[in-house]
């Protein structure tokens, strides 16, 4: 009976008996059952009320009788006693004995029970009441009074569900009549409207249901498939007298509303023509957030990480995070210049980190608001990743100390797919943050777009239903209802560690921004808004009428905050410069100097001792757990690794293993995430071993490398790029002493996460003075696999590099490291396992952090020539930005007729072609391993070595793609434009690659011919 399923759509009118008969009653999974009803050897036709259509009600009565025999009618008490004694159902029923003073009542009851139609009616009426209660629980929110303006229904539907009793004539839906309103009905165990009472008159049942579900709070929860959670919510919203606030709580709420409202009014007075995306119309957001934080702090949370869009951001910074007001006001001063490196960002995108005492709980709490772009909802997974990292570093495995709060706009919450992606990370083992509180500022409009044009679902919050998150809709002009809902939301998160949504149904008093005219597109709405009293005024009038505060106290509260703002404004006039670093959302204490500079500009050797290389190699080629049966094919792979270790060589997978394993020894936590990364898309990695005989028994050998090593997290992600890359970026924000890698299944698919790359990874430091060392591993290579499995689009990453192609960087002792410090990200395409090993280790050994983009190979993973010796990985070795020609051509450089620069896999095709043409002495091939920042110094050295050679850039990508457009101007700057730079590669194309194998091979043959035809460019200028 607890598992009834009722469609959420509006029911078509049915009679009560039809409704009852149409329901399928399932037995509860509870241990207590009334077996006599289920195992009968005698006919029971004499008692049709025991049939399946009524069994739900009978079982409800039985459970109530078990708990308290006096809670049911005497006839049921006798029936259950007899039935439990072994009587058949037909014989179990007896009329109750004389009750003396209640003889007439008893006679009436006996006659009713002896009359079979009346017994059926009694049962059907009780079942009808159960259905009525359930209807309110499921659909009561559809008629809740949620819109402060009284214009729209929050669910965009003015129809009232047929089973919600808004007038007495609708009782007929349940087969009830107005005369039944004063009849007393036993309450089922699935409701708490009775409080301590087990039965209520129908009139009172309806009144209490209306009060619980149809006032200023609408509760969506009946889609949740966990009975305990449903019961918990019912108790929170149905129990009588739940929404009681004492006078002190009301005064605190009023003071918070004063701060929220007067802050916006102060900004409007001082900077009336500035965009600030104010909170007018949803001022209750500030006390709402503070309530969630207060309640969570009381439950043990000491770190709250928040993400939000532009709407109300300055108010949140001022009154929730408690950013100094003068620093906020400085952002409005157009004359102040920022002293930090980078370009900065607008004030309503900036983040903040602050530790303070929570005055309600008297406990320390740290608040962080993550900086974000204008791309709505893009910060959602970033916040979740940062939250996960902070939980990881403090050992908070259940989310009891660190939590996330995400704020959303109604249009974006419904419209942006990243919301869905982020929700689906919420319960994944390696991505869960153990519950997020989502607060939707539902101002019922998206810029100029009506919600009826902006979503197909009744509410903007319907996406949350996919993860069984309860949704609490609340009228934002009822501050006490908002506070109650926020308390419940925080308590839900603390109790169940699951997501929850608070939908603040409000309005936007101004246009999209303060300069926008909303009357163009929403004239009727804004006529009503112009008449609408501010929530502060309404609530103040309420408290004054209740005697909680008087007019003088209210005005003093306003004056006190106005004075705070004026004094901060005066102090802001003394500021001479802006500091973006004051708005840092993720500080790294101790990593930089006090003024935020690297502690050195050198990078130590990235090599390892032979002993460490051998040890890691041995672990990588074994199973460090007893009685663990691995797949036969994997046994061959591990055996091959063992042979390589004996021969002191590594392939790509083993080089990666050694780089990561060595960092674990140094206390660096490593997290590798992405689709299929545990095994590797190309079945080369195998960092997680699976027992072939025991389901779900796994082993991660890399966590068995060293005593006291840092943990290694390798996790297959959901089939998402946008959400998962954002999550990993957020994880990398939390600490510089961790290596976070995200690998695309194929490099081609990274563009699904383009927003994270364009708005966070590439410009993050320039906008927010926030370094990040995330590593992107993007499998790339033209191998005849078609246009969607060939290219990681290197041209796009290179286009976004911030180095000047026409300017030679200033020479210095630390030229290479200085270049890395000045760049916005590092782009490499390694051609050897050893160089990949070094660049991964360098990422951590650098004294600062930059994103690293690695175009990783596919065919080279098993290429017999793509091997490196231990000698290339020993102490004193390092990452080679260029690998110069080392063959016969280097022995007679003046005789070399062509110098080919290339990068990545194409090198092996070039060397094979050169060998086949017997041109080793005529053509030198140099590999540019680090594309950005461009190695001007080493390229110059290589060019000067071959004075008689013409210069060719060769790539396997099409001419309008790949590296050519980036490399050519930098090569020309390197040689001071003394020679032309020729191109050998595929012709320009719209698609990254052909899908035809023959065409692929024809293109390959053509550009290899061009590369080695020494007369190919004669006559060209």
Curated annotation (Swiss-Prot):
One of its GO terms (molecular function) is oxoglutarate dehydrogenase (succinyl-transferring) activity. Its main location: mitochondrion. It catalyses: N(6)-[(R)-lipoyl]-L-lysyl-[protein] + 2-oxoglutarate + H(+) = N(6)-[(R)-S(8)-succinyldihydrolipoyl]-L-lysyl-[protein] + CO2. The keyword Coiled coil does not apply. Its cofactor is thiamine diphosphate; Mg(2+). There is a cross-link at residue 533 (Glycyl lysine isopeptide (Lys-Gly) (interchain with G-Cter in ubiquitin)). Expressed in the brain. One of its GO terms (biological process) is glycolytic process. Mg(2+) binds at residues 410, 443, 445. Calcium ions and ADP stimulate, whereas ATP and NADH reduce catalytic activity. PANTHER family: 2-OXOGLUTARATE DEHYDROGENASE, 2-OXOGLUTARATE DEHYDROGENASE COMPLEX COMPONENT E1. Belongs to the alpha-ketoglutarate dehydrogenase family. 2-oxoglutarate dehydrogenase (E1o) component of the 2-oxoglutarate dehydrogenase complex (OGDHC). Participates in the first step, rate limiting for the overall conversion of 2-oxoglutarate to succinyl-CoA and CO(2) catalyzed by the whole OGDHC. Catalyzes the irreversible decarboxylation of 2-oxoglutarate (alpha-ketoglutarate) via the thiamine diphosphate (ThDP) cofactor and subsequent transfer of the decarboxylated acyl intermediate on an oxidized dihydrolipoyl group that is covalently amidated to the E2 enzyme (dihydrolipoyllysine-residue succinyltransferase or DLST). This is 2-oxoglutarate dehydrogenase complex component E1. The lineage of its organism: Eukaryota, Metazoa, Chordata, Craniata, Vertebrata. The gene is ogdh.
